[in-house]
Amino acid sequence: VMSYSKKNVIRGLHIQTKKSQGKFVSVLKGKVYDVAVDLRKNSKTFGKFFSYVLSEKNSHSIYIPPGFAHGFCGLEKENYIIYSCTQYRNAASERAIKYNDKKLNIKWPVKKPVVSKKDQNAITFFKFKEKYLL
């Protein structure tokens, strides 16, 4: 899967609640601030986020295991991100957690974020836990 984003665009935090996907993420062009949130309820790092800067210059890639929500923001004018996923897309089980959730407290390096309507309407981390993990 390939994704294109412009500077200041934030996508996420996305997860499939059924057949959760592991993702291998790389940047072909540009630079992104990539975030993964651990949603595995029995994990020692449950509710914690991990962030990485991925770019065409540093050539870093990351693997995000199943059970993590994923999001990123574009840091350059044009950003091309490629994913290799461990499961097929399951649109019926796609969910989103607010990128700016107060509990998660992710410090996005963007002053004026551009966010899709879908992601603006995402639920809080607390509501996600209540609805899908308890």
Where are these regions (language model features)?
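Non-catalytic, conserved peripheral segments adjacent to functional cores
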Residues: V1-H60, C73, K77-E78, C85, ...
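Glycine-rich nucleotide phosphate-binding loop and flanking beta-alpha elements
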Residues: H70
